[in-house]
Amino acid sequence: MLGNSIQLIGKEKNYYMEQYKVKGMSCAACSARVEKAVSAVDGVTDCTVSLLTNSMSVEGTADAATIIRAVEKAGYKASKMKAGKQSGGATDEDDALKDTETPLMRKRLIASVVLLIPLMYVSMGHMMWNWPLPPFFEGNHVAMGLVQLLFTVAIMVVNQKFFVNGFKGLIHRAPNMDTLVALGSAASFIYSVYALFAMTDAVVKGQDDMVMHYMHEFYFESAAMILTLITVGKMLEAKSKGKTTDALKGLMKLAPKTAVLVKDGVEQTVPIEQLHIGDLFAVRPGENIPVDGFVKEGNSAVNESALTGESIPVDKNPGDPVSAATLNQSGYLLCEATRVGEDTTLSQIIHMVSDAAATKAPIAKVADKVSGVFVPIVISIAIVTFVIWMLVGRPVGYSLARAISVLVISCPCALGLATPVAIMVGNGVGAKHGILFKTAVSLEETGKVQIVALDKTGTITKGEPRVTDIFPVGCEEAYLMHAAYALEQKSEHPLAKAIIAWGDANNQTEAGVGEFQAVSGNGLMGVRDGKHLQGGNWNYISGQIRIAKEEETELRKQAEVYASEGKTPLFFAEDGKILGMVAVADVMKEDSPEAIAELKNMGIHVVMLTGDNEQTAQAIGKQAGVDEVIAGVLPDGKEAVIANLQKKGKVAMVGDGVNDAPALTRADMGIAIGAGTDIAIDAADVVLMKSRLSDVPAAIRLSRATLRNIHENLFWAFIYNIIGIPLAAGAWVHLFGWTLNPMFGAAAMSLSSFCVVTNALRLNLFKFGKKQRETA
């Protein structure tokens, strides 16, 4: 949501996703109206409106002017967001998240309360508590009525926004929450004015009994109290809504505003916008790193917790990458900028969290449908309530009070906020710990997975294999390893790293290999000094060599021993003659067994995918504690395995992004682990910045906690209206004698949205500890 215009890859030239600020929305009915109006514009393929951030995301080919006109025709105002040049720079996104509502609400509330106190004293103090009135009012009922009228008018002027927005919505045939408040308070006021005129006429005619009758028909204090209480609720709601975006606002504040540019050996402090790719910049101890780059000179420990949630500092040496907003703790670093502005890791995280908040979870669709028709239905119920009570013989004042109660107790805001506030808070909590959900859908659906498929290398293991055993056959160990080192030099397979690392450590010299060819998932071949080298697993190598039965038996027997220990045997041959075998083992991550155990405790079936042979795979799977091992899976075969697993339930595929894209895309939920600074992994729905496997169950628990919170919010929003509206209408009067004064209805309405937002804020208490249960 930071950029104002993004051309989508694979789309036609004029196809864009653009962000807009929307002004004038007060409830879910408003956002539904805007969404409907913009979606009807030719060229718009998708439109999502966020009531929480007062923003709108539009996808398609329609031009901005047409979209803005559609919003204005619906009765609201819109403007295109401007892209910020730097992650740390001010943008319209900052403005969209800035809490401008609370200060205004506070001023309105103070003015309303100051005016309400004398109004309540005059209208109810003498009658209810026998408080003394000024002598001027003794026997002067018209004066009492006029004073109440003046105070009420003043309070209505202070809260004129309800009337302006409410009646504007009515004119545009798009009634909203403000319409309900405006109609309720206006009806109370108009009827009270009528009662005041009628009482004045009775005073002139000397009809004392009618004077007292009409005195009791004054609802000035109800109109004023409704407006004041709704303002209290809106202020509490605005303040709480501001807190839901704290995590996102915190991310925006992380990047420094300046950087120390080093040019020709001279240091100069410049605005961060003046730093470009390739520039050198200096970072002293205690300073935040301004942009992404790598260390040219110096050594230090850098705290990356702002991005990853990992509190342990990471050592940085020449050549190591550094990220914007991380804290240099100990040494002086001279770095070269590689990514600046909106390309930094920090900006990408802000984009991701912000964009996720702009999307809608499937569960929100029910609330959106109800919100779209909620206000017209409530107005209809209020009219029917008034008519029914009049028909059964109740006085106008009583009938009107019931109708007003229906109007002011109904709350579409609670319905509209139930899902987005929970999504925003849940996403923010995840981002602070290096868990990034790309969309609201991914945050909702991750918790529903039943099967988790884990790619072995880089996910369960560290992806840092090492040579454990060397078994030469018919040649010296040095000859075998030199051949293996020469062949693996050109391989990109993770296991090749082990042999290359061994060769480097043992001062092996690089031998040129020509005609190199990699056979996907099986082996390698190449030519060295006129001789053909082959390397790979037994299935591949056995078809390339001639070997005596005794030698094969001995070799296979030793390979089985290695495999039973969780090691992967690699075979090498030259000109069709076996040279021997090298056993390689990857190191398991410290938290893998515990994370897998936690997944199993959550009722999730855990599957390990690996290209290793069955025996090696089973040994590693047993160490890790997985439920099922699928061995011999080639990189291009993972997608088919995922498709097969999906027949048994919802599948999450967890991989490090290397050769995993098709499988991540095929799975119901693709989770990329260990993304580090490369978080723009298109195939993944969830991005885990660290290589901690424990973040997988944490992401699932957070998703479940968020979904549970949404259910609680929706339950409260629906049950509040289901119980409140009949109570306000007087449906239980004849059975239990229960009824509801309009003032209490307004108080209930003012608290409903506040309760929903406050409940969502409980997600900030979510624990990521190893032993924590699914609590929020």
PLM region spans:
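Conserved catalytic phosphorylation-site environment of P-type ATPases
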Residues: 307, 366, 401, 414-487, ...
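Conserved cytosolic catalytic loops of P-type ATPases
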Residues: 42-59, 69, 217-218, 249-343, ...
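Flexible metal-binding regulatory segments at protein termini and peripheral loops
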Residues: 1-143, 155, 168, 266-267, ...
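Membrane-embedded alpha-helical bundles of multi-pass transporters
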Residues: 128-142, 171, 190, 429, ...
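ATP-driven catalytic headpiece of P-type ATPases
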Residues: 105-107, 326, 447-492, 522-607, ...
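Transmembrane helix-loop-helix hairpins at the membrane interface
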Residues: 104-258, 369, 470, 737-740, ...
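Conserved ATP-binding TGD loop and adjacent catalytic N/P-domain core of P-type ATPases
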Residues: 32, 45, 449, 528-530, ...
